[in-house]
Amino acid sequence: MIIVSYDISDDKKRANFSKMLKSNGAIRLQFSVYEVRNTKRIMDNLVAKIETYAKHFTADDSVILFDVDSDKLTKYGNAIHRDQAIVYF
């Protein structure tokens, strides 16, 4: 699994970055931390998309990718901020 952690100062850029992660199957664990299923194709695609965002980063912005063995991961608490679907009839 890949853990993506980011600190982006601009609200609009941060929101767009979050939407991009979600559209690539990322699950929000905390406000600026996402979990992504790891395959070479997904990782290559994700890195390419992050590089397009990185061109617009300021000196205060950062994105860190962690390649984590899910069998060695320990989670405490229930801090998963998944968006709930809303359905209108």
Please report, for each region that a protein language model flagged, where it lies by residue.
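Extended, hydrophobic alpha-helical segments
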Residues: M1-R41
